Amino acid sequence: MNNVKRLPLHDFHLSNSAKFTTFAGWEMPVSYGSSVSEHMRVREDLGFFDVSHMGEILIKGPQAIDFLNYVLTNNLNRIEDGQAIYSLMCNDNGGVIDDLIVYRISVDEFFLCVNASNAEKDFLHLQTLVEPFECSVSDLSADYGLIAVQGPKAINFLEELMPEYFSNISRMHFSKKEIWGETSYIARTGYTGEDGFEIFLPVSVVSRFASLISSSSLSTDTAWIGLAARDSLRLEAGFCLHGHEISEEVSPVEARLLWEVCLEKEDFIGKLALQKQLEDKTFGQVLHYEVMDRRIPREGSTVFFYENHAGRVMSGGFSPLVKAPIGTAYIEGDFLKQKQSPAWFAEVRGKLLPIKFSKPVLKR
């Protein structure tokens, strides 16, 4: 535990009865009571997430957009100042180094939010590639905390609480603001499938903001949401988690994330490999499923088509919305034409549980 990092709000969460787990090298709140109740609170009301473990990287300089268009799969020319876009960072083989959100401050300044488990790796990767470009790469991860407020009532809550900061920001847009004298970024983005904001705050004011939203909550129940509910929320929404649905061994083609890839760009790292994979047409795919049983297949469990080994589970959990286990699985290309067959199973402790492939819960 000596090398495990703690959030700036660690003691705050302790005082709110948080139970902790270790994730991506951080000691994180996994729940504050019932993770199912926390999940449904976000679906029906609103919830607060401390995701200060996420990494922040600033790219700045006259060739910042050229650099990012080379190292990322999406086209940064598609967005204007004040807009955000999802993208992937691939290796030469088309595998995904990380998935991230890019916030365009200006044509020569971009703010990246990257996964905590990859933050250091991403920063070093970008540093090794930036030399030919007239721009700089700065790691701001230690400088910023990140609080997310998500749910159908999140927008009204924050607009009423701090209207000067949260009004008139559209989805996938953000605003650079001075909050209590500190440069902050307020983004209408999220990882739950619900509307809401993600607020990047300097660590000097993140505690003040957390106390403000907590004391202003109209509910007597805790509004703070842990990692367990965050994972079930993203599974229902169909969002990928790096190291599961995507990795350096799983490409955007296989993960069905080509909407985050602009193959029309002149060049970017991984483009040739992705084009070749599409031409070969032998790739497997990541599919969402529901289990026809109460037991939950976990990551690494074998997926069978009849008695044939056909894939593996990448994520598994319980969906409070459909009240059943759901998950994702990588299915080998030879079996994809049979995905509507009723003869699919996932193995749990030697038992074969029937599964059916479907759209993510929130997209049905």
Language-model segments: which ranges?
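Acidic, proline/glycine-enriched N-terminal capping motif
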Residues: M1-S87, G95-I97
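Glycine-rich, acidic
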Residues: R6-H10, T21, E27, V130, ...
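Short glycine-/aliphatic-rich beta-strand segments at the starts of folded cytosolic domains
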Residues: G47-T73, L140-E159, K281-V291
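Helix N-cap motif at beta-to-alpha junctions
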Residues: P62-Q63, N115-E120, P152-I155, P202-S207, ...
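Short amphipathic alpha-helices in soluble, non-transmembrane regions
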Residues: V71-L72, L124-E131, L161-M162, F209-S217, ...
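Glycine-centered loop/turn motifs
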Residues: D81-I85, A119, S167-K176, R298-G300, ...
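Glycine-rich, small/acidic residue-mixed loop/short-helix segments
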Residues: V250-R364
